[in-house]
Amino acid sequence: QRELLMEVTGLHEIPEGAYNIRANGESVERNSTSNIEIITKEDKSGIEIHIKPGTKRESVHIPVVLSKSGLKEVVYNDFYIGDNADVTIVAGCGIHNGGDAASRHDGIHRFYVGKNAHIKYVEKHYGSGEGKGERIMNPVTEIHLDEDSFMEMDTAQIKGVDSTKRENRAYLKDGAKLVVMERLMTHGSQRAESYFDVQMDGEDSSANIVSRSVAREDSYQLFDSHIHGNNRCSGHTECDAIIMDNAKISATPELSANHVDAALIHEAAIGKIAGEQILKLRTLGLTEE
């Protein structure tokens, strides 16, 4: 479990600040601070994280690890981030499956980001184990950005996840800004599907969704991005994928301009590896070799 924890958070020990560590279906360690309170949901599995207005330079770690084969869970985590807060949230899930039964974690994360708040959200998914049982993760991220708030989402899946369906929805008010960087690598017969649906409802809102991926061997990837400009706004979505071996990749970016001052751009590039693409691979955490 400690190895999984290190892979998804980069931590070798219990973090400072607020944290909730979930292992094999239950919360095993938790700490709240004077500004960040973590409480257990009463009606379903999961937690609520309440961050006081004006909280600065604090972090929340909420990793999940599964090391028992055959475990399946759905967890609901809701984040309430007060006005003018500036915090980092580190999530992620690691599954070690040494058995024959599938292990599955579906994490449903909802963010309610207050006015002028600044959030960095880091999410990493990792799988290991030599068993025949599948390692399945289906994260859902729902983001509500209030006026002039900013959220940066950095999500990565580098290894060992057999099947994933990643759903992301965002709703932006006036002046809100969303930046997403997705990094993905699949191999073997893995399947990865990523869905983004962004509603830019507010005046001068903006969204930038970038996916960098590598598909190897017999794996399959789908990138499906919908950006809706419902006001004066700017939106950009980009899929940049490297295909190798017998892999398959589909990219379906879609733009909907519903306002005369909506400025929307999409870019999609899929191709085999070339010299300049080594740099892209290195952004996935791989070495040049």
Feature-to-residue mapping (PLM):
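Conserved beta-strand/loop scaffold segments within soluble protein domains that form the structured core
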Residues: 19-24, 28-286
